[in-house]
Amino acid sequence: DCIVNNAGITIDNLAIRMDFNDWKKVIDINLNSTFLLSKFAIKKMLKNKSGKIINITSIVGHTGNLGQANYCASKAGIVAMSKSLAIEYAKKNININCISPGFIKTAMTDKIDEKYNEILLSKIPSSRFGEPEDIANAVLFLASKQSNYINGETLHVNGGMYMA
């Protein structure tokens, strides 16, 4: 069995101007839903004596980003939670890993204005945004038997923009 947690919303604002309800909504959808779905999946995986959980985070969970304190905190929290869960359930044959996308061509990145797009592209060594298939291929790998000895890790898929 395998579950992919891929919740992600943004409600951006500078921290001093951010409404607490916007903070909470992003944390609830991005981080808390990942925890709750993982908890449910782990119960099923324990019965089946194996499983894989793949949590989608974000490059900004590692780097921070202007006006996205809530989003960055939610995605960094997923990384830390995944490491803890990986430790808790490794002996039960459950692998828990993250994929941390950089800037991928999606509806979320379509909202970025053209000038900022150029700035971002200049920071990506591969000089392009990723494709959704780049993330899908990473998911397929972590869901496969080829990744059975990988646990508690984050696979960075970002064209070299962030290197851990």
PLM feature segments, named:
Residues 14-15, 22-27, 109, 120:
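Substrate-binding pocket helix/loop in short-chain dehydrogenase/reductase
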Residues 124-135, 146:
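A conserved structural motif in NAD(P)-dependent oxidoreductases
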Residues 58:
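Residue(s) in the substrate-gating loop at a strand-loop-helix junction
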Residues 16, 63-69, 91-92, 127, ...:
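Active-site loop immediately N-terminal to the catalytic Tyr-X3-Lys motif
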Residues 43, 87-91, 148:
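Alpha-helical segment proximal to the catalytic Tyr-Lys
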Residues 38, 74, 82:
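Active-site helix of classical SDR
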Residues 90, 95, 150-152, 158:
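Short, small/polar-rich loop/turn modules that mediate ligand/substrate recognition or access, typified
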